[in-house]
Amino acid sequence: MASSVLSSAAVATRSNVAQANMVAPFTGLKSAASFPVSRKQNLDITSIASNGGRVQCMQVWPPINKKKYETLSYLPDLSQEQLLSEVEYLLKNGWVPCLEFETEHGFVYRENNKSPGYYDGRYWTMWKLPMFGCTDATQVLAEVEEAKKAYPQAWIRIIGFDNVRQVQCISFIAYKPEGY
């Protein structure tokens, strides 16, 4: 019985050595990094490993006088050509264009639901009916112009509705009132 205990310990030692050789070497933030480190701790903060040379920082979106309207609303307003391109993309995917407008709160706020998340409690008013059967992007932009004339102080957005899956697939602001 003692021989069986001894042989199983020898087998366990051998398998540990084999496993250690099979593990890929550690690659840290710096090429000179090694794992595990067995040296005296250096409390000088200038010697702490830094990957700062490889990081490209992006400017944070300024929250002052910059309300958030929709996803990607921090980008500049879309030009007429860009709007036309977005609507053509919407139509190419077989989605139904629909215009909505909001006269009071075009930006994100919480009214009906106080918990954070995708749903923010806003309801936009639909401009006419969804444009079922529309195949021309200029028709959609003509409706945007008509909505602008009727409600010059409203936010107007274009959504793309997939009537097969019954979901909204795209949404973007087409017009913001002056001063926003």
UniProtKB/Swiss-Prot annotation:
It holds the Pfam family RbcS. Keywords: Antiviral defense, Calvin cycle, Carbon dioxide fixation, Cell junction, Chloroplast, Photorespiration, Photosynthesis, Plastid, Transit peptide. One of its GO terms (molecular function) is ribulose-bisphosphate carboxylase activity. It is found in: Plastid, Chloroplast; Cell junction, Plasmodesma. InterPro entries: RuBisCO_ssu, RuBisCO_ssu_dom, RuBisCO_ssu_N, RuBisCO_ssu_sf. Residues 1-56, 1-57 form a transit peptide. Transmembrane segments: none annotated. GO terms for biological process: defense response to virus; photorespiration; reductive pentose-phosphate cycle. Its main location: plastid. GO terms for cellular component: chloroplast; plasmodesma. Heterohexadecamer of 8 large and 8 small subunits. The basic functional RuBisCO is composed of a large chain homodimer in a 'head-to-tail' conformation. In form I RuBisCO this homodimer is arranged in a barrel-like tetramer with the small subunits forming a tetrameric 'cap' on each end of the 'barrel'. RuBisCO catalyzes two reactions: the carboxylation of D-ribulose 1,5-bisphosphate, the primary event in carbon dioxide fixation, as well as the oxidative fragmentation of the pentose substrate. Both reactions occur simultaneously and in competition at the same active site. Involved in antiviral defenses. Belongs to the RuBisCO small chain family. This is Ribulose bisphosphate carboxylase small subunit, chloroplastic. The gene is RBCS.
